């Protein structure tokens, strides 16, 4: 039963009264609960969550009073929200990342104007043990029915914000009411719905980790380790002194992995090693430099910083250094580092991560749960590449929190509310799944909300299907009116899942806005075809775009992904014009989609910032209108592909080019003039004629790679030679080395032989006679 809060709190001698409320209203009504929460949190070295629900001004006033009563200094408080209503640090929700890597005694999260799930995920981890996370919200009974700025971002045309369901916020409120350590105060009624007190035993002093007996790092290093996990991670880093070693550290947020990396970096620099640190942003790696500098000071060695705060380089006198470079610069291993430390590796594309495998020694540290996300790139694809490398790999897992007790209820709540710990089903439950044993299911948001295990399995698989998954993706899954979920289940457990987005069906005015360069939310495929490829009518047909698709790792290569796509097409074929997809192209993925009936209509000319690959757009038409749409875009793609491959796409993987062209599914004849055919026929007499006019050779290559008259005419290596030399115009020397020819002469002769075979396949009889004159 809610309890009534007593009347106004009077000042008590010795209390902090230094906060100023900028609303102009008095901060009254008893908030003794805050004092009790803080006291309990400090005794147990845990955090507590205080929800103040009601009128915006009143909740802000009560927040000021609560923090005063809880004896939280303004200097240790941050407000995250639209207004800086306290005399303390303030950030908008859009700038919540400013709290990453920092520690605060209290964070006040003002959710009155909007609730951004990513901002919650980024800020809750900043609260130290003994601290408070204060959430300001509208009345909880009506909050799920309200629509805010974040909800508006989920409404993509032709849907409006009124179509957003509010399921995420409803579930969010339910978790607040269900979890330990969370106090809820209705400031309008003056009642405490729940006090959040758990009566935990006092925290016991944690003994310092025992240093390893055979340590190579100096003894001062292990004296700075706070947990056994951290000690074990630091000891694993000792292997980096030897070339050919790799260390992979996976940890939840707040486990001290960056600090452990910093302790290792300090030791290595003191031992005359050049340590290169990189990460998606400097702030994610800043703790490495803080900890390395502290350790060097403990060593008593002379070293310099390139700047007094946030240093990006530490130089040890007469020894090595620790230096930072952003990933695009660090990937070339500038100045030959001895060791590379990649922080938050899961946030980097696989293509970028692979480049660090050339370092003498390397560590990859990443967050397992949390907004940073460990998605397909790191957990699946890159792990495979790492295993194939020549590096000896040491795996380290860190689970013990550094700054608060491992029984902390706020972390438990955050993991549940944001599904940061979502996982697919364990292998044993689904290892017998086959296309014949699975059930196709249409999963509504209501279905997912009603079954927590089902929601965790679905979201856990979707996390693995993408390079980076954030809490906002959970809100989209539950609330976005254009999204639907389809899955295959085996004995009730999810083995494959797809997230679909409705696109197209746009009004004339929306299509005009899009065509003229205006921003229209969602509708990625119509946007690309309309804005970039100048086809305004592309927004008329209605389609379903496959945003993500994933199959459980234990049952891959059994045809379950194809089974799911087949069921999706069968369900939607009579209701939409097309099913489509856009993704970072790899040879394997392009072949998968092509085998399932999808055809190439576009290949982006810049790499995707998330995947690091060139994105391909593919369509599977379901209606005559969509068939016409796909046909004209296939034609236009064939028209332009040779030109873009020799310029913006000249570094595209030749196997991607081969797969993308083969997936165009359009037989376009070779159209060469008589003179161009004579040029082609002359290549066997000297491949240098290719430089005279590359156009006919490109047309012939495009024809064969997209729709070969004889698919066995050329080997994969010969097709790669066509891509690299004819389509991408790489120098002979580069092609010779990449494709392992003995000499440039051999490379030229091979190309001449290839052109001869293609000429006989596609040339008229008189062309073959011309060819014979040069043999």
Swiss-Prot record:
Ranges for region Disordered: 1-33, 191-215
Species, as recorded: Haloarcula marismortui (strain ATCC 43049 / DSM 3752 / JCM 8966 / VKM B-1809) (Halobacterium marismortui)
Pfam family, one: GNAT_acetyltr_2
One of the GO biological process terms: tRNA wobble cytosine modification
Positions contributing to acetyl-CoA binding: 549-551, 556-562, 588
Function, in words: Catalyzes the formation of N(4)-acetylcytidine (ac(4)C) at the wobble position of tRNA(Met), by using acetyl-CoA as an acetyl donor and ATP (or GTP).
HAMAP family: tRNA_acetyltr_TmcA (MF_01886)
Enzyme class, broadest EC rank: transferase
Gene name linked to the record: tmcA
Location(s) in or outside the cell: Cytoplasm
Protein name: tRNA(Met) cytidine acetyltransferase TmcA
Residue ranges of domain N-acetyltransferase in the record: 438-623
Alphabetical keyword list: Acyltransferase, ATP-binding, Cytoplasm, Nucleotide-binding, RNA-binding, Transferase, tRNA processing, tRNA-binding
EC number(s) per entry: 2.3.1.193
One cellular component term from this protein's GO annotations in UniProt: cytoplasm
